[in-house]
């Protein structure tokens, strides 16, 4: 426990909290244009071809975003919405594309967990 004299000389310093998603600039989502759509491989011990895209955001940031779900319709110059959320086995991927918003279509034939993949309720 510090004495009052010590605290007067050198006060306590608050820890600075660093954002995990700096490109969003405290917004829930951001819009951007795809500059490159490609696949990449995850870290060990996983193995796959993960679909990702490089995006130039409206605020000038250039980020890599993961495209979730089976199949997508994105190509260069597609306008997409991104949200925060990293992909644990892809280094440098800190954002997700929002399916079913702007140019990114929802996942075809999706029946469960539809809201996460931009799919409307099917007709009964």
UniProtKB/Swiss-Prot annotation:
Q: Does the keyword Nucleus apply?
A: no
| Keyword annotations of the record | Methylation, Ribonucleoprotein, Ribosomal protein, RNA-binding, rRNA-binding, tRNA-binding
Modified positions (3-methylthioaspartic acid) in chain numbering: 89
Provide a Gene Ontology MF annotation, just one: tRNA binding
GO terms in the biological process aspect are: translation
At the top level of its lineage, which domain of life is listed? Bacteria
CDD domains per the UniProt record, alphabetical: Ribosomal_S12 (cd03368)
Write down the InterPro entries for this protein, in alphabetical order.
Answer: NA-bd_OB-fold, Ribosomal_uS12, Ribosomal_uS12_bac
Signal peptide from the UniProt entry: none
Q: Does the keyword field hold Ribosomal protein?
A: yes
Name a single GO cellular component: small ribosomal subunit
Pfam families annotated for this entry?
Answer: Ribosom_S12_S23
**What SUPFAM superfamilies does the record tag this protein with?**
Nucleic acid-binding proteins
Q: What does this protein do?
A: With S4 and S5 plays an important role in translational accuracy. Interacts with and stabilizes bases of the 16S rRNA that are involved in tRNA selection in the A site and with the mRNA backbone. Located at the interface of the 30S and 50S subunits, it traverses the body of the 30S subunit contacting proteins on the other side and probably holding the rRNA structure together. The combined cluster of proteins S8, S12 and S17 appears to hold together the shoulder and platform of the 30S subunit.
Family, per the entry?
A: Belongs to the universal ribosomal protein uS12 family.
Query: What interactions and quaternary structure are annotated?
Result: Part of the 30S ribosomal subunit. Contacts proteins S8 and S17. May interact with IF1 in the 30S initiation complex.
What HAMAP family does the entry give?
Ribosomal_uS12_B
What protein name applies here? Small ribosomal subunit protein uS12
Origin organism of this chain? Haemophilus ducreyi (strain 35000HP / ATCC 700724)
């Amino acid at each position: 426990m510090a004495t009052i004299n010590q605290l007067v000389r050198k006060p306590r310093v608050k820890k600075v909290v660093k954002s995990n998603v700096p490109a969003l600039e405290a917004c829930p989502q951001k819009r951007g244009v795809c500059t490159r759509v490609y696949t990449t491989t995850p870290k060990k011990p996983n193995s796959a071809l993960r679909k990702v895209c490089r995006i130039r955001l409206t605020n000038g940031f250039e980020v890599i975003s993961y495209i979730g779900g089976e199949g997508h319709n994105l190509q260069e110059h597609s306008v997409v919405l991104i949200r925060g959320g990293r992909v644990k086995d892809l280094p440098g991927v800190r954002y997700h594309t929002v399916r079913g918003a702007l140019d990114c279509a929802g996942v075809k034939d999706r029946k469960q967990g539809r809201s996460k993949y931009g799919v409307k309720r099917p007709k009964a």
